Amino acid sequence: MTTFYTVISWLSVFGYWLLIAGVTLRILMKRRAVPSAMAWLLIIYILPLVGIIAYLSFGELHLGKRRAERAKAMWPSTARWLSELKECQHIFANSNSEVASPLFQLCERRQGINGVKGNQLQLLTTTDDTLKALVRDIELARHNIEMVFYIWQPGGLVDQVAESLMAAARRGVHCRLLLDSAGSKQFFRSPYPAMMRNAGIEVVEALKVNVFRMFLRRMDLRQHRKIVLIDNYVAYTGSMNMVDPRFFKQDAGVGQWIDMMARMEGPVATTLGIVYACDWEIETGKRILPPPPDANIMPFEEETGHTIQVIASGPGFPEEMIHQALLTAVYAAREQLIMTTPYFVPSDDLLHAICTAAQRGVDVSIIVPRENDSMMVRWASRAFFTELLNAGVKIYQFEGGLLHSKSVLVDGQLSLVGTVNLDMRSLWLNFEITLVIDDDGFGADLAQVQDDYIARSALLDGERWNKRPLWHRVTERLFYFFSPLL
């Protein structure tokens, strides 16, 4: 009996180290950033069982077998649709400004289509303006409404949006609503899903959270896009979730959330539509490609208006696309670079690009919230401040609430707005959407908004920053080490 237990003990020890060795080898063989690999190895060797379970759950990008098969199956039809779209040459921009050309060329070669022109574009900077405009557009809808959001939380003006959406469905408008399971958990626990389905709205819970399937699909992979499409002509996207900030996270101690949205009319609605169609097919298996380009786009033909490129990122879309786009935009800057983000945990490449821009004479400003709803991100982001300050980057800490807007403005001409945070989750993991706008008029509008943010912010003083307590420095470095996992 003693021999039996001895054998079992040795087999357990052997299996234990074999499992650690196997996971270690898998991490080393995967093509990933060195800081990320080192962080995972540290966790596994300090807390082996916890680390292995965490890595198998969150360490690799598992879309899930069923969704991966759908993503693979949809591309032939999507490619044909894009080929038909490219025949409508009148909607595509033939040239771009000097600062925007590299980024638009990158997008065209990686995504297959160029930016579209002739769009009307309005920047909305308050929740009230956005939700009221959205209600008006829903009330005017005649054919179809598609929406995707990370968070939909009932309450306040959001309930007016829900009521107008149900009224539209009852009068015959085809309505689809795609909401992230984790972000919109309060919505799915409310009476609204049943009410909306009874009204005729297709409501889909995206990327359902199921602990029993945690090893089959990465649970923290989230649908982070915010898109509204109405009659294939009007579109919205930006940083705002479907929430009324007067009722959202009031106990978080960070103040009201500050967002911006873009309202568009024109052919960009069609390019956003193909992104929505892909998301819908990946989640439901149903194909809903936008109407044929000729029927849908001809009314949009205009010589004036904004030129916009759409960047869709996430599993099943061109790899590293948004990361490459941000790097290209930063390196294109010659005079000024302004970035706003609620979560600043950049990759090493992006950090170095920003610092290099400042060191070659570009006026670089980063606007982040002073208070953050994520304690881990708050400390991790502070670990980058010293390097940024030493390079000459100006860091503004917004004091008027949780600044949730995501924007980049390059030389007053090239603008990027959308859902992407400057952190690892947005850059490498989540489903995100970004608008790239080549227009100095829109750039002036965005600059005005950013100037307002700066006026409500405090400039971080380098000398005072260097005198912060030792325990702050230690905490920052601790969270910095795990920043590749945030």
Swiss-Prot record:
SMART domains assigned: PLDc
PLD phosphodiesterase domain ranges (all copies): 219-246, 399-426
Gene Ontology cellular component annotations, sorted alphabetically: membrane; plasma membrane
Catalytic residue positions: H224, K226, D231, H404, K406, D411
Keywords: Cell inner membrane, Cell membrane, Lipid biosynthesis, Lipid metabolism, Membrane, Phospholipid biosynthesis, Phospholipid metabolism, Repeat, Transferase, Transmembrane, Transmembrane helix
Class in the EC hierarchy, top level: transferase
NCBIfam families linked: bac_cardiolipin
PANTHER family: CARDIOLIPIN SYNTHASE, PHOSPHOLIPASE D
Family note: Belongs to the phospholipase D family. Cardiolipin synthase subfamily. ClsA sub-subfamily.
Protein name: Cardiolipin synthase A
